[in-house]
Amino acid sequence: MAVLAPLIALVYSVPRLSRWLARPYCLLSALLSIAFLLVRKLPPICNGLPTQREDGNPCDFDWREVEILMFLSAIVMMKNRRSITVEQHVGNIFMFSKVANAILFFRLDIRMGLLYLTLCIVFLMTCKPPLYMGPEYIKYFNDKTIDEELERDKRVTWIVEFFANWSNDCQSFAPIYADLSLKYNCSGLNFGKVDVGRYTDVSTRYKVSTSPLTKQLPTLILFQGGKEVMRRPQIDKKGRAVSWTFSEENVIREFNLNELYQRAKKLSKGGDMSEEKPGNPTPTAVPDGENKKDK
């Protein structure tokens, strides 16, 4: 079962993964990830390259290059143990493959290493990771609307994600959060998002650090009666996030979503709150002047 479950998940994710991989960002990232393999293996490119092989074959890996590639495989396997989505697995492979490529190119020739490093920098500056653009029941806030919405109707329970576009963890969590909003959104239980990378005063006001060192992104906060009730991840005394996995199961369990949903449904039936049926996606509500691509 330990092997079967990931295989089933991979097969289930093939259509979505193929669309994700077909985007320019992923294609270019894959090309950079196999750059050294192409240079070392494809003649006439490999002809004349320096090598430490005893047979002097420049178009095959030497023992040190094999060691580096094996070490890369071990690192990827260790990092992927905490990955939730297939996109996270592929993203880890891309990232560590580029690091290994840079080491291999610098070892081969410092000029080739500098050229590869320049290409990676240009890629990072010009290509942005694909954002999740699927169906969701999520309202996007700005620095003004978040406080107004939380105070507008205190009977409504809000779960708000504080995110930043540059965070890979936030991008990986986006489809999971969208699925949760489709399953649990109703008139008494709403889902929201705010870009603290864009609205820095919001991050200060709600004490969500945007520093990569604190690992506080993404942060989920539960609001009831306009007040914060709980958040994940929790913060230790040094201001760093306590390790927490943003999986669908963890969010449902930690935030008691099933109980919150049933309570919100009873509230909507007993009061004058309009009923919304989760599972049927509607256009995402965003503040004036913003759209999901801005996120």
From Swiss-Prot:
Q: Which InterPro entries match?
A: Thioredoxin-like_sf (IPR036249), Thioredoxin_domain (IPR013766), TMX2 (IPR039101), TMX2_thioredoxin_dom (IPR037463)
Q: Which GO terms describe its molecular function?
A: disulfide oxidoreductase activity; identical protein binding
Which ranges does the record list as Extracellular topological domains?
49-102
Q: Where in the cell is it found?
A: Endoplasmic reticulum membrane; Mitochondrion membrane
- Disordered: annotated segments: 266-295
Query: What are the alphabetically sorted keywords of the record?
Result: Disulfide bond, Endoplasmic reticulum, Membrane, Mitochondrion, Phosphoprotein, Signal, Transmembrane, Transmembrane helix
Map motif Di-lysine motif onto the chain.
Answer: 292-295
Per the record, ranges on the Cytoplasmic side are 126-295
Cleavable signal peptide: 1-48
Q: Looking at the record's lineage, which domain of life comes first?
A: Eukaryota
Residues bearing Phosphoserine are S211, S243
| Residues covered by the Thioredoxin domain | 114-269
One biological-process term from Gene Ontology? brain development
Purpose: Endoplasmic reticulum and mitochondria-associated protein that probably functions as a regulator of cellular redox state and thereby regulates protein post-translational modification, protein folding and mitochondrial activity. Indirectly regulates neuronal proliferation, migration, and organization in the developing brain.
Domain remarks in the Swiss-Prot or TrEMBL record: The thioredoxin domain lacks the 2 redox-active cysteines, suggesting that it lacks thioredoxin activity.
Q: How is this protein named in the record?
A: Thioredoxin-related transmembrane protein 2
Source species: Rattus norvegicus
